[in-house]
Amino acid sequence: MNRLLLAGWIFFILLSVCTESFSGMVVSQTVAFHFQPHPDLSQFLVMDFTELTVPEAFIQKIGHAFSFFVLTYLLWKQRGSIRSAAAGSFAFAFFTEVLQLFFSRNGCIRDVLIDAVGIGLFYGLYVLAKRRKQEMYEKY
């Protein structure tokens, strides 16, 4: 069951990053792809954070972090290793941002960092929960 959930979540992320318009996918339930065989790869290095002042963009970036929080959890359940799950999630975050450039979307290192916030949040909560569990066992 974990494997199926993981595959479904990966499919959802890939669909979300490759479709022409994420908001079009959500609002009008339209999925369309526009492949760009020769993207401007220099766009990947753009680190413009001013976009985050737009409420819709900020909410979408929260979705980025949440998606990779969930992915890290699902990978951890599948692999059993938090470090492996975090590394796999980070590699997938990097891959999806580069992939977006080939589908007429904005893929950039800034979004990899935002994805890493979700990964780091799960990692931190995992470590915290593990410590608390260990403290409880030592206490009793």
UniProtKB/Swiss-Prot annotation:
Chief location bin: membrane
Induction summary: Expression is sigma F-dependent.
Annotated InterPro entries: VanZ-like
Domain of life: Bacteria
Compartment(s) where it occurs, according to its Swiss-Prot or TrEMBL record: Cell membrane
Transmembrane segments: 4-24, 56-76, 84-104, 109-129
Keyword tags: Cell membrane, Membrane, Transmembrane, Transmembrane helix
Membrane-topology annotation of the record: Multi-pass membrane protein
One Pfam match: VanZ
GO cellular component term of the entry, any: plasma membrane
Function according to Swiss-Prot or TrEMBL: May be important for peptidoglycan remodeling.
Protein name, per record: Uncharacterized membrane protein YwnJ
Source organism (scientific name): Bacillus subtilis (strain 168)
